[in-house]
Regions:
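A polyanion-binding, active-site-adjacent surface
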Residues: 2-6, 22-223
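Charged/polar low-complexity intrinsically disordered segments
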Residues: 9, 14-19
Length: 223
């Protein structure tokens, strides 16, 4: 059981108000929360909570600025990500980087990118509900440590897990939702844009809305 000193209690009361994520109170989760990024990443890299650990090459923990005000969340690693240990490095990742650059964002400077699941599902299938649930604790901890102001869900799976289970991404992408003190938005997954290039203008409109919102509430992202 995690024991807090008085200083930590004050900090955790603040987090309870701001970080009550994924349909769970912070106090219910506190015994599983990490205080340091290094310990979180170390344990995640050794995770064997579901069967995806048996087929992975690398755990794909995430990439970017650990103090980012904007957090992007995808569904899970693909083949290239599994081989390189970094999210969104294949063709979809290259497209994502171009879209980020268009609104002055950079995965290595002013945002963080993570996934719902940290290990590649075989044949790039959607992660199963039980796999998502086994892995979501790592993401909760990342969110609690990063403390972003905006979360952007890349694709249907992430949006349904993070924003709401009945999310209709084709109709509700680009709309901001407030959840537990955080602004959240979903946009189309880069892989979906590669399959259907006609949707690229819609996704770019989402990014322009994101840029406007960053300018409104994120004082450090562009500075």
């Amino acid at each position: 059981v995690y024991i807090f000193d008085r200083l930590n209690q004050t900090a955790f009361r603040r987090n309870i108000q701001k970080k009550n994520l994924f349909n769970s109170t912070y106090l219910e989760r506190r015994k599983n929360m990490y205080e340091s990024w290094e310990n979180l990443e170390r344990d995640c890299l050794c995770c064997e909570k579901c069967n995806l650990c048996k087929t992975r090459t690398n755990v794909v923990f995430g990439v970017g600025n650990q103090n980012a005000e904007v957090l992007f969340i995808g569904e899970g690693p693909g083949q290239n990500e599994d081989l390189q240990g970094e999210p969104f490095v294949g063709r979809g990742g290259q497209l994502l980087d171009k879209m980020l650059k268009a609104i002055d964002l950079d995965r290595n400077k002013n945002i963080y990118i993570a996934n719902i699941v940290k290990c590649r599902p075989p044949q790039n299938r959607d992660p199963l509900p039980e796999e998502q649930e086994a892995c979501i604790g790592w993401l909760r901890n990342q969110v609690a440590l990063i403390r972003p102001k905006i979360i952007v869900c890349l694709g249907r799976i992430a949006a349904m897990k993070i924003i709401k289970p009945d999310m209709k991404i084709t109709k509700e992408h680009g709309i901001f939702f407030e959840r537990n003190g955080l602004l959240m938005m979903a946009t189309l997954h880069p892989a979906a844009l590669l399959r259907n290039p006609r949707q690229k203008p819609d996704a770019f409109e989402d990014f322009l809305k994101l840029q406007k919102k960053i300018n409104e509430i994120c004082e450090h992202t562009y500075n």
